[in-house]
Amino acid sequence: MHQGAPSWGRRWFVVWALLGLTLGVLVASAAPTSPGTPGVAAATQAANGGPATPAPPPLGAAPTGDPKPKKNKKPKNPTPPRPAGDNATVAAGHATLREHLRDIKAENTDANFYVCPPPTGATVVQFEQPRRCPTRPEGQNYTEGIAVVFKENIAPYKFKATMYYKDVTVSQVWFGHRYSQFMGIFEDRAPVPFEEVIDKINAKGVCRSTAKYVRNNLETTAFHRDDHETDMELKPANAATRTSRGWHTTDLKYNPSRVEAFHRYGTTVNCIVEEVDARSVYPYDEFVLATGDFVYMSPFYGYREGSHTEHTTYAADRFKQVDGFYARDLTTKARATAPTTRNLLTTPKFTVAWDWVPKRPSVCTMTKWQEVDEMLRSEYGGSFRFSSDAISTTFTTNLTEYPLSRVDLGDCIGKDARDAMDRIFARRYNATHIKVGQPQYYQANGGFLIAYQPLLSNTLAELYVREHLREQSRKPPNPTPPPPGASANASVERIKTTSSIEFARLQFTYNHIQRHVNDMLGRVAIAWCELQNHELTLWNEARKLNPNAIASVTVGRRVSARMLGDVMAVSTCVPVAADNVIVQNSMRISSRPGACYSRPLVSFRYEDQGPLVEGQLGENNELRLTRDAIEPCTVGHRRYFTFGGGYVYFEEYAYSHQLSRADITTVSTFIDLNITMLEDHEFVPLEVYTRHEIKDSGLLDYTEVQRRNQLHDLRFADIDTVIHADANAAMFAGLGAFFEGMGDLGRAVGKVVMGIVGGVVSAVSGVSSFMSNPFGALAVGLLVLAGLAAAFFAFRYVMRLQSNPMKALYPLTTKELKNPTNPDASGEGEEGGDFDEAKLAEAREMIRYMALVSAMERTEHKAKKKGTSALLSAKVTDMVMRKRRNTNYTQVPNKDGDADEDDL
């Protein structure tokens, strides 16, 4: 910021300059004046009453002594000749005046001067009276409080159910010699009767092996393993899921016994008990099980508390409700401690059971969405607007409350709202606020229900109570109560909530911007109006002091004015170019000692080539045609005058230097406009329904259905065990059935026979299996070859035995006979020459008796087999033969010859 007064260095410079000018004036007064010297004294003399002289050249002309003057060109404003008495020294001391003025004009080329003639009263004006300022637009009945926002409950009603059914599988198999082929598999599912569920499954943990069901209006019965009906124990499933358990009676499918080249049938009945999740959606007329099976009956149907009016599509004999039902855990066999009311329903495919509960308050069509600690309610026109910065939303509702009795199945709304409000109030407002009345309910656009609890600070509680009592006093003393059946007969409806909250976010944004802009514009309008009224009062007083300035500002252009009573007479001012105006350097009146001009003297032209007009510089660049602004000269005179776009500084009534407007400290007269910038606001993500809620809103969970269906075989069947067809199974089954029909003795004999037959079959099967092995076949082949070789050698031996028995039986003896080694024997033989006849006869007799002994043993053996008579006959024959055996034998001399040996 430039200071208006010159610095101390500049002041000392001005003092020395004035001293120099004073000495110059004294010297010049004694010296003759050169006739052509330019200066300002001529203008001063003319002002003192001397002859009028032309004005000095305009400020835009080139000064004397320009280093590069333009030749052969007539100046635009030629300098008039100066009188001979001009003070040349003073003019030389102030030679820089034009340059300073030229610099000021160059900095502010748009600064104009105006010549304002005195008004004659032909045109008069008056000021407008003060206006009534507008009021700031505001909402009405601003209320703070706690809010709980409810949305439509799209989540299904979930409960546990138990399925009872029997999987029936009938398989047709054709058996070949080396392979088996399924010709058809029939699978069906049959329900379990109520009596079996209660008396067998829940009471004992067993299930019958038969399945009775109706297909094509024909009752049929399936027997497990094609056998008689028995009780089978339920066992836990192989793989349990995270949300349910299961039990069943068998793992393996029953296949018929193997009979080659025949078609056989086998039946499997697997009793299954399975815990599943059930789901039902509004209006709860049906529910679906996790297996994908639909039940076309309301889960709240029953015979208690009027629940028989709920929806059902089944006949009465298919449904049964059991009071005081104690469920049993089929795994631990433990019985429940608390009884329940159990619903049982049989369908063509299964029987389902679940615990009955009343419809109210088990389900609710609305659910809590947001708890808002700070909710501002404002009234705009015919609606309420509930705004919250915490969730960046604005809800629009009617002015009337929404009765909860109109909400179908809305019992949870009041309870949940009160619990949430009490919790928020106790945590945050218990020490500073009080509750005003009961919670109020409003239905907002988009299907939201707002529970609102108005609050009031403790400091305003007393005032509010008085106001409330005043309002109550204005109401009728005995209001007409509603009819008794009004609430009961009111129609109920379900509130549908939109899935997007963007409209409320946009409404909040619009209200936020609207509130800010309206508040800002309201303050601007009020401040502007009040400022105008204030300025009007000031102008009415200021026009009396300076009517020209007030009239010029009011009209919007430069005019001259004077007061004619209570009105102003105005006249239009004529603009004069800044290049046609020059200020003189002295404000003293030479003809009147002690008198000085109060404002600088000027010379100007209306047009570029027009004559000079002498005048005086007025306020705000006004050129006065008169020079009557005179004042007594004072010591220490210092003045700043507006000249063009800047200021000229006169000290001791003489020009000193120029200043720009920036060198003068500015004091603002403007009133600050209180405009608050729009604050930043961040929007947080807000969802009405989460992805999990949307995914869970459907009646069917297809992922769960597919998972259960694909897991069914893994849970209730053994998929790893492989049963190979056995050709002997039919024989064993027949033998077993035969001996079973003979009682206990038959069963005992059957076990022995079955064991023996099983051993034989196992041995044969082992041999067959051994033969089917390549190594076994090789071993058998080698054994066969060995047997053939042994048979060949045995056949040779028999042939030798037939041809020469003694040589075959006694090969070494006959060999010694051919080659004797004993000399005595050799000599004796050589001497004897022939065999001993006695020994030869004795040998023959021995052979005959050996044959007789063999015949007798064979006869006795046969007699033992034939019986007693044959045995007696054999004994008699033996006695006869013994008598023949008593013949006396004598030793035969051993005289064998060589000829006999050759015969042998």
From Swiss-Prot:
<feature type="modified residue" description="Phosphothreonine; by host">
    <location>
        <position position="887"/>
    </location>
</feature>
<feature type="short sequence motif" description="Internalization motif">
    <location>
        <begin position="889"/>
        <end position="892"/>
    </location>
</feature>
<keyword id="KW-0325">Glycoprotein</keyword>
<feature type="glycosylation site" description="N-linked (GlcNAc...) asparagine; by host">
    <location>
        <position position="398"/>
    </location>
</feature>
<keyword id="KW-0472">Membrane</keyword>
<feature type="disulfide bond">
    <location>
        <begin position="364"/>
        <end position="412"/>
    </location>
</feature>
<keyword id="KW-1133">Transmembrane helix</keyword>
<feature type="glycosylation site" description="N-linked (GlcNAc...) asparagine; by host">
    <location>
        <position position="489"/>
    </location>
</feature>
<dbReference type="GO" id="GO:0020002">
    <property type="term" value="C:host cell plasma membrane"/>
</dbReference>
<feature type="disulfide bond">
    <location>
        <begin position="133"/>
        <end position="529"/>
    </location>
</feature>
<feature type="signal peptide">
    <location>
        <begin position="1"/>
        <end position="30"/>
    </location>
</feature>
<keyword id="KW-0732">Signal</keyword>
<feature type="disulfide bond">
    <location>
        <begin position="207"/>
        <end position="271"/>
    </location>
</feature>
<dbReference type="InterPro" id="IPR000234">
    <property type="entry name" value="Herpes_Glycoprot_B"/>
</dbReference>
<feature type="short sequence motif" description="Golgi targeting">
    <location>
        <begin position="849"/>
        <end position="852"/>
    </location>
</feature>
<keyword id="KW-1160">Virus entry into host cell</keyword>
<dbReference type="InterPro" id="IPR035381">
    <property type="entry name" value="Glycoprot_B_PH2"/>
</dbReference>
<feature type="region of interest" description="Involved in fusion and/or binding to host membrane">
    <location>
        <begin position="258"/>
        <end position="265"/>
    </location>
</feature>
<feature type="transmembrane region" description="Helical">
    <location>
        <begin position="775"/>
        <end position="795"/>
    </location>
</feature>
<dbReference type="Pfam" id="PF17416">
    <property type="entry name" value="Glycoprot_B_PH1"/>
</dbReference>
<protein>
    <recommendedName>
        <fullName>Envelope glycoprotein B</fullName>
    </recommendedName>
</protein>
<keyword id="KW-1040">Host Golgi apparatus</keyword>
<dbReference type="InterPro" id="IPR055341">
    <property type="entry name" value="Glycoprotein_B_ecto_C"/>
</dbReference>
<dbReference type="InterPro" id="IPR035377">
    <property type="entry name" value="Glycoprot_B_PH1"/>
</dbReference>
<comment type="subunit">
    <text>Homotrimer; disulfide-linked. Interacts with host receptor MYH9/NMMHC-IIA. Interacts with host receptor MYH10/NMMHC-IIB. Binds to heparan sulfate proteoglycans. Interacts with gH/gL heterodimer. Interacts with the host coreceptor PILRA.</text>
</comment>
<dbReference type="GO" id="GO:0046718">
    <property type="term" value="P:symbiont entry into host cell"/>
</dbReference>
<keyword id="KW-0812">Transmembrane</keyword>
<keyword id="KW-1015">Disulfide bond</keyword>
<keyword id="KW-0261">Viral envelope protein</keyword>
<dbReference type="GO" id="GO:0042802">
    <property type="term" value="F:identical protein binding"/>
</dbReference>
<feature type="region of interest" description="Disordered">
    <location>
        <begin position="470"/>
        <end position="492"/>
    </location>
</feature>
<dbReference type="Pfam" id="PF00606">
    <property type="entry name" value="Glycoprotein_B"/>
</dbReference>
<keyword id="KW-0946">Virion</keyword>
<keyword id="KW-0832">Ubl conjugation</keyword>
<keyword id="KW-0597">Phosphoprotein</keyword>
<feature type="disulfide bond">
    <location>
        <begin position="596"/>
        <end position="633"/>
    </location>
</feature>
<feature type="glycosylation site" description="N-linked (GlcNAc...) asparagine; by host">
    <location>
        <position position="430"/>
    </location>
</feature>
<keyword id="KW-1043">Host membrane</keyword>
<dbReference type="GO" id="GO:0016020">
    <property type="term" value="C:membrane"/>
</dbReference>
<feature type="compositionally biased region" description="Low complexity">
    <location>
        <begin position="32"/>
        <end position="52"/>
    </location>
</feature>
<dbReference type="Pfam" id="PF17417">
    <property type="entry name" value="Glycoprot_B_PH2"/>
</dbReference>
<dbReference type="GO" id="GO:0019031">
    <property type="term" value="C:viral envelope"/>
</dbReference>
